[in-house]
């Protein structure tokens, strides 16, 4: 298996060629999302279709270079054939007030699975519980509800929160803590057979209007522990998660992501990083290349439910006139065409364009050095 720099078999296109087809966009978000109000991305009008490079600005060059490897692989190399032409997706609810939940859900027509952001800085468990309750009430008892803490809790906070939120019949909890060892401990304490003695049972649970279960079984999903780790397989070897959340860009592209999930042997949900439709297309092709889970108890590298690929609905605009948005709870697997009018409308300021070009140049140099 190749390392974090991308597939060893992928030829690196020359930097001049990459920069010549590059545009930078800055698209406002509809709702502040994990501190982001404007999403910036470098878009390449590549030979095999548009590709995207959009690591968040705070990421260092070593980490960002995997995202560039993904963009260059997607835009300049043939990809694995998809097994289906549509992918089921989930709605994503940012850390908004509970009263805004219906408005957010309306942007995801037909979705029967919802991921709810929790553990937002400056908020507490009462805010999370109100938000998750609003989602459950809006969606009804048959919908799947997931929570995503983005590693925002410590072990005790995670156990406390997830025992409480189990009231709402969670599908799974994504990255409740940052470290692999922490995930192992949280998973152990939320498994059947745990004593159920914790800081949010009895009186504390009643304060929030919840009825915490004695022994909640909450599956644990790993995201950051896969995509931001030097060893993306460590979480699987440690038994720290029940399933993996994989994102094509930070893992170096579709082919490398497929290699990782095959070796990990855990069920998979494919997600995005608040991408434009171009980045979403990469995620859709990854999801469509994975076999579907068949019934309960499915194991191995299979697609395990609705994917977090509907997030273009959280952007005010896009780089295509026909964005990849949920319809009937699914999105068609296709490569969107860039729209010159949208690229102009959302063009980043000149100083941000320069910043992204310099970043691509540095990351390309890292990839080039690694290839030799």
What does each model-identified segment do?
Residues 1-39, 50-54, 76-77, 82, ...:
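Flexible C-terminal active-site loop/helix
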Residues 27-36, 86-100, 118-120, 149-155, ...:
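Active-site mouth loops of central-metabolism enzymes
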Residues 44, 49-53, 85-93, 112-116, ...:
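Hydrophobic faces of well-ordered beta-strands that scaffold small-molecule active sites
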Residues 75-78, 91-107, 121-123, 131-134:
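Short, charged beta->alpha transition segments
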Residues 121-281, 285, 316-324:
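Catalytic core of soluble alpha/beta enzymes
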């Amino acid at each position: 298996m190749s390392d974090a720099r991308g597939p060893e078999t992928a030829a690196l296109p020359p930097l001049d060629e990459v920069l010549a087809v590059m545009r930078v966009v800055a698209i406002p978000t509809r709702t502040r999302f994990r501190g982001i109000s404007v999403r910036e991305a470098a878009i390449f009008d590549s030979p095999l279709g548009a590709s995207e490079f959009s690591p968040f600005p705070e990421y260092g060059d070593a980490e960002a270079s995997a995202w560039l490897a993904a963009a260059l692989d997607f835009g300049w190399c043939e990809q694995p054939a998809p097994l289906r032409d549509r992918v089921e997706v989930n709605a994503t609810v940012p850390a908004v007030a509970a009263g805004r939940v219906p408005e957010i859900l309306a942007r995801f027509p037909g979705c029967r699975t919802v991921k709810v952001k929790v553990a937002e800085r400056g908020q507490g468990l009462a805010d999370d519980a109100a938000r998750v309750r609003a989602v459950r009430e809006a969606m009804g008892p048959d919908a799947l509800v997931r929570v995503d803490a983005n590693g925002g809790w410590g072990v005790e906070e995670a156990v406390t929160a997830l025992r409480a939120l189990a009231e709402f019949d969670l599908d799974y909890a994504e990255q409740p803590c940052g470290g692999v060892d922490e995930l192992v401990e949280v998973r152990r304490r939320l498994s059947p057979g745990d004593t159920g003695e914790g800081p949010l049972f009895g009186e504390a649970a009643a304060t929030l209007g919840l009825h915490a279960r004695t022994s909640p079984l909450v599956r644990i999903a790993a995201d950051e522990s896969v995509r931001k780790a030097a060893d993306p397989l460590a979480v699987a070897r440690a038994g720290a998660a029940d399933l993996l959340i994989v994102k094509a860009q930070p893992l170096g592209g579709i082919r490398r992501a497929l290699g990782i999930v095959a070796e990990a042997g855990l069920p998979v949900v494919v997600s995005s990083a608040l991408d434009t439709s171009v980045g979403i297309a990469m995620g859709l092709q990854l999801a469509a290349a994975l076999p579907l889970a068949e019934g309960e108890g499915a194991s191995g590298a299979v697609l395990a439910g609705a994917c977090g690929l509907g997030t273009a609905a959280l952007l005010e605009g896009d780089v295509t006139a026909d964005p990849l948005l949920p319809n009937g709870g699914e999105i068609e697997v296709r490569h969107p065409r860039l729209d010159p009018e949208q690229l102009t409308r959302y063009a980043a300021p000149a100083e941000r364009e320069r910043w992204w070009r310099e970043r691509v140049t540095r990351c390309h140099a890292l990839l080039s050095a690694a290839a030799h």
